Amino acid sequence: MANAKTIKVTLTRSPIGCQPKHKLCVKGLGLRKIGHTVEVEDTPSIRGMINRVNYLVRVEEN
């Protein structure tokens, strides 16, 4: 897993007022506060969560 491709995801907008499924995607990505950045593996399930909340996050590919 050391060679696994990773991506950095940063929460740029608050999920307050969003659909409950979108809030769960933000939580599933491990994001807590605005400006919080996490490094996650680049998998199809992670990409799906990012695509669902693309208006709330910024993505940086490594």
UniProtKB/Swiss-Prot annotation:
Full protein name: Large ribosomal subunit protein uL30
Q: What gene is it encoded by?
A: rpmD
Q: To which protein family does this belong?
A: Belongs to the universal ribosomal protein uL30 family.
For this UniProt record, the keywords arranged alphabetically read as follows: Ribonucleoprotein, Ribosomal protein
Assembly, in brief, is: Part of the 50S ribosomal subunit.
Q: Which GO terms describe its molecular function?
A: structural constituent of ribosome
Matches recorded under Pfam families:
Ribosomal_L30 (PF00327)
In the UniProt record, which is one GO cellular component term?
Answer: cytosolic large ribosomal subunit
Alphabetized InterPro entries for the sequence? Ribo_uL30_ferredoxin-like_sf, Ribosomal_uL30_bac-type, Ribosomal_uL30_ferredoxin-like
Q: Which Gene Ontology biological process is one annotated for this entry? A: translation
- Give the residues annotated as coiled coil: none
